[in-house]
Regions:
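A structural micro-motif
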Residues: 2, 26-27, 48-49, 86-87, ...
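Hydrophobic Val/Ile/Leu positions in short beta-strands of Rossmann-like dinucleotide-binding domains
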Residues: 4-6, 66, 130
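Short alpha-helical
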Residues: 11, 37-38, 71-72, 95, ...
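Phosphate- and divalent-cation-binding pockets in alpha/beta enzyme and binding domains
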Residues: 15, 41, 75-76, 98-99, ...
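Short, solvent-exposed amphipathic alpha-helical segments in soluble enzyme
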Residues: 21-22, 81-82, 144-147
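Rossmann-like NAD(P)(H) cofactor-binding subdomain of soluble oxidoreductases
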Residues: 36, 45-121
Length: 178
């Protein structure tokens, strides 16, 4: 049983949160968003509390899922207490694992596919890429995500970036052509 905090209230945070809660073994104890209305809206969906202040983040969680835009990851990480004992993980395809160098336990939970919070998404068909800074961290993240997405696999930062570029081309490139 893991206690988790969702950092972000957008597409990936919403679908991960809903699927983790529906799976039933884990609890989301807090949702952070810089927009308090968005934090509260997602907190209501996942039966949690909300905050719009990273200094008020619960420091007792087992996992902190950072599901924010690539442009916001660095500022969010800079504002998190570095003493967190729990795993800190982001969901970005393009952000290296070394952004967490100041933390103890860290990893990546990467869905290589566009996810929309307003469209119910069956995450079981998405092959999530998982990366961890240690075997123990990797195994915790892998077992958590594999329970909701059986096609989950291990990947390195290099593999994830290549996968991300492929996914961007497959999902978005044709839009750019027209």
């Amino acid at each position: 049983h893991m206690k988790m905090i969702l950092i972000g209230s957008g597409n990936v945070a919403t679908q991960l949160g809903k699927n983790i809660v529906a799976q039933g073994n884990h609890q989301i104890i807090q949702v952070y968003s810089r927009n308090s209305a968005n934090a509260q809206a997602l907190a209501n969906v996942v039966n949690s509390t909300a905050t719009d202040d990273l200094t008020q983040i619960n420091t007792e969680a087992d996992l902190y899922i950072i599901a924010v835009s690539d442009s916001a990851i660095h500022s969010v990480i800079a504002d998190l207490p570095k003493s967190l004992q729990g795993i800190v993980a982001h969901t970005s395809g393009a952000t290296n694992l070394d952004v967490f160098a100041d933390f103890i336990n860290f990893g990546v939970i990467y869905p290589p596919q566009s996810i929309n919070k307003s469209i119910e998404t069956n995450l079981s068909v998405i092959p999530f890429g998982i990366e961890g800074n240690s075997t123990q961290t990797f195994e915790k993240l892998f077992s958590l995500i594999q329970a909701i997405a059986p096609k989950t696999f291990a990947c390195t930062s290099q593999q994830r970036l290549a996968l991300h570029l492929s996914a961007v081309i497959a999902n978005n490139f044709s839009n750019a052509l027209f």
